[in-house]
Design a protein with these regions (language model features):
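Single conserved hydrophobic/aromatic residue that forms the stacking wall/gate
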Residues: 1-11, 15
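Beta-solenoid repeat scaffold
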Residues: 9, 410-412
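Structural signature of tandem-repeat unit edges
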Residues: 16-29, 39-52, 62-75, 84-100, ...
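Extracellular-facing binding/remodeling surfaces
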Residues: 18, 106-112, 133, 266-273, ...
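Consensus positions within tandem repeat domains that build extended binding/scaffold surfaces
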Residues: 31-36, 54-57, 77-80, 124-126, ...
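Short, aromatic/basic amphipathic alpha-helical patches
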Residues: 399-409
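Cellulosome-associated attachment modules in secreted, modular CAZymes
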Residues: 421-506
Length: 506
């Protein structure tokens, strides 16, 4: 008997000789797989107050025949009672197993099924792999459809989801290969990951106005999906959400960069040097993944987010300009870019994602901002050419950075504290920050703004070329000394003395 506990944790009690148990008052949750495979367990009493039974909590309890479930239970996880005699008895009594108005199991259903009124949720995996299911009527009053609720129902032809539904879980209709049409409720705010992945007969979908986020691979491999209505309310479209759809192929034929609602979804058809339009705010995950002919990318300062694996496996990519406007840089963004030799991580980034530069075998120099607090696992793994790391902060600040597993190439490189990555062969003449052919007070002012903003930890918008032009003494950083040299240079030239930079420095 459990006492003085408030929760039974994941995989808590895999005890082979446990025969009965009472979950006492005070416990509010039973974790995932908490009693899984306790094959001697025959009975369990769950006291009032428990609100959640986790995924597979009693999975594989092959002797469990008696379960007392109180009305306080609000959530029943995926396959919580799978392979128990208790569930088998329930299935023999009805093809729809309903507990506390929650539809837990319908795996033995076939044909067209009408879910009864009063049901408030369809729980995770309730109809998963129910190949005999051809149609489903969901009553108004159902508010949620759980993860994988109808996944693998390959004969399910159409679904009308009532307006009462506000949440649809991950993979809810994944691989419903016979699904031809679906009506989504207007109250929906997000399409979760893999919601309709592999629905190969789906031809048209209207995403309701109000949806803000479309999850990872939400419609991936919906090969016949030709028509998609995406409202302006959508502000995030995750990795490969529409990949391998007829809609995406048609968009790529129109323009190698597919952009929707200021989100760059796909650029895999691009080659050579590419400039992303300044209307783009987000580069979605895997947007340029495996773009074998891409050699250079210029990212505008309108972009704030670059998703996971956005430029991964671009073997000819030698240069990329990431502006300081980017405040979110996903994992594996440049992994496998084997020709990349230098990289600058934007000033607003505080965490270096896992596998960020993994396998960048030609990477020699990298600039990291002073505000970073952690470097993810494998971020610089297999970067064997890395020799120099330019860190914007002090050695003391670097010592506080948490560096994850498999980053020996990073920690073994030469650290340059308080310095920026030097620009070799800068395109702007020394001192001419606006590249207008003359060196005057406007250039001095631009350098002063850069130094002031950098000191305050802010982004001045100064480009690498401008920074290189302002580094008068060539010590790898721009500071008050460089500004002094510029002032002296302008003053002498104003007095008619045509001195060189070497004269000024000496």
């Amino acid at each position: 008997r459990l006492q003085t506990v408030t929760g039974v944790q994941t995989c808590a009690l895999p005890i082979s000789n446990l025969q009965s148990i009472t979950i006492p008052a005070g416990v509010t949750s039973i974790g995932s797989s908490a009693f899984a495979y306790c094959d001697a367990l025959t009975a369990i009493v769950i006291s009032d107050g428990v609100t959640e039974i986790g995924d597979r909590a009693f999975n594989g309890c092959t002797s469990l025949k008696k379960i007392s479930i109180p009305e306080s239970v609000e959530t029943i996880g995926e396959k919580a009672f799978q392979d128990t005699p208790w569930l088998t008895l329930k299935q023999e009594g009805s093809t729809l197993v309903i507990i506390n108005n929650k539809l837990v199991d319908g795996a033995n259903c076939s044909g067209n099924i009408i879910i009864p009124n009063g049901v408030t949720s369809i729980e995770s995996s309730a109809f998963a792999d129910c190949t005999g299911l051809t149609g489903i009527t969901i009553p108004d009053g159902v508010t949620s459809i759980g993860n994988s609720a109808f996944s693998g129902c390959d004969n399910l032809g159409s679904v009308i989801i009532p307006e009462s539904v506000t949440a649809i879980g991950n993979s809810a209709f994944a691989n419903c290969t016979g699904l031809k049409s679906v009506s989504l409720p207007k109250q929906l705010k997000k399409l979760e990951n893999w919601t309709f992945i592999g629905c190969t007969k789906l031809t048209e979908v209207t995403i309701p106005d109000g949806v803000a986020d479309i999850g990872i691979q939400a419609f991936y491999n919906c090969s016949n999906l030709k028509t998609i209505f995406i409202p302006k309310s959508v502000t995030a479209i995750r990795e490969n959400a529409f990949q391998n759809t007829a809609w995406m192929e048609a968009k790529k034929a129109e323009n190698p960069m597919v952009i929707v609602n200021a989100i760059l979804l796909n650029g895999e058809g691009c080659s050579g040097n590419v400039t992303i339009p300044n209307t783009v705010k987000i580069v979605s995950g895997s947007a340029f993944f495996g773009c074998t002919e891409l050699t250079g990318v210029v990212i505008p300062d309108s972009v704030t987010i670059i998703g996971d694996s956005a430029f991964s496996s671009c073997p000819k990519l030698t240069s990329v300009s990431v502006p300081d406007s980017v405040t979110s840089l996903g994992g594996s963004v440049f992994s496998g870019c084997s020709a990349l030799t230098e990289a600058v991580v934007p000033a607003g980034i505080t965490e270096i994602g896992e596998y960020l530069f993994w396998g960048c075998t030609s990477l020699e120099k990298v600039q990291l901002p002073e505000g970073i607090t952690s470097v993810g696992e494998y971020a610089f793994d297999q970067c064997d050419a890395l020799t120099d790391v330019y860190f914007g902060g002090t050695q003391e600040a670097w010592d506080m950075v948490s560096v994850g597993f498999c980053n020996d190439t990073l920690t073994g490189a030469v650290l340059h504290y308080g310095e920026s990555l030097p620009v070799e062969n800068p395109s702007y003449p020394k001192g001419d920050l606006d590249n207008d052919g003359k060196i005057d007070t406007s250039d001095i002012f631009a350098a002063m703004v850069y130094v002031a903003y950098k000191g305050a930890g802010l982004d001045s918008g100064t480009t690498p070329e401008q920074i290189a032009a302002a580094d008068i003494d060539g010590d790898g950083k721009v500071d008050s000394t460089d500004i002094y040299y510029m002032l002296y240079y302008v003053a002498l030239h104003g007095a008619g003395q045509k001195v060189s930079w070497e004269d000024v420095i000496s």
